[in-house]
């Protein structure tokens, strides 16, 4: 399933992230691709807000990974193919990866990062195209492109039943709300 959205501002990109983040329950893998300045980190900031994370979110360019935890437990939402899980914290974990400085995808395996992609937290990976061979078949890809100084194109590509249902709910919630 594919969904194309045009964002007209950073604020709108962040709101789109919030709407998607509100639907995440754990175990999701979201892969972000786009050139510098397309809004990958802005979208991730919105995702974190939607998940109930109040920390300042910035790109982990030099550390490859930053971990955040929401202050609230996720509200149960029935999404096909998803099994509710217990989290060791009050809320949901967000694992924010940035592969911009990654030289070899094997480094991620050597560092044990692959384990995160099959865990109970939400993984968001910026510059995901640098490690295409590592990703599970089922996932949500988001490709961002600059259209103008403030305008961005976001293409959501869902692979697998869980991610298709997630994208359907996101589309319904996004277009059912005005002022996006």
Residue ranges and their predicted role:
Residues 40:
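Conserved lysine of the Walker
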Residues 1-19:
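N-terminal pre-Walker A segment at the start of P-loop NTPase domains
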Residues 30-32:
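Hydrophobic anchor at the beta1->P-loop junction of P-loop NTPases
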Residues 21-27:
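Phosphate-binding P-loop
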Residues 37:
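Walker A (P-loop) phosphate-binding loop of P-loop NTPases
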Residues 53-69:
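Short beta-strand-centered segment that lines the nucleotide-binding/catalytic pocket of NTP-utilizing
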Residues 71-91, 178-180:
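Intrinsically disordered, low-complexity terminal tails and inter-domain linkers enriched
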Residues 3, 103-108, 114-180:
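Short phosphate-coordinating micro-motif centered on Lys-Gly-acidic
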């Amino acid at each position: 399933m594919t969904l194309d959205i045009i964002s007209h501002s950073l604020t709108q990109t962040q709101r789109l992230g919030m709407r998607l983040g509100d639907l995440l329950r754990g175990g999701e893998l979201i892969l972000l691709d786009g050139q510098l300045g397309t809004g990958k980190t802005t979208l991730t900031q919105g995702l974190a807000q939607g998940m109930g994370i109040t920390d300042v979110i910035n790109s982990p360019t030099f550390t490859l990974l930053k971990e955040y935890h929401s202050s609230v437990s996720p509200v149960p939402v029935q999404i096909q193919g998803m099994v509710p899980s217990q989290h060791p914290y009050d809320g949901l974990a967000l694992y924010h990866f940035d592969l911009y400085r990654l030289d070899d995808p094997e480094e991620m395996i050597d560092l044990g990062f692959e384990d995160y992609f099959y865990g109970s937290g939400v993984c968001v990976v910026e510059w995901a195209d640098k490690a295409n061979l590592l990703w599970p078949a089922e996932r949500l890809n988001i490709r961002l492109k600059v259209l103008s100084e403030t305008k961005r194109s976001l293409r959501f590509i869902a692979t697998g039943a869980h991610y298709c249902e997630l994208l359907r709910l996101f589309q319904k919630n996004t277009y059912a709300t005005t002022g996006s």
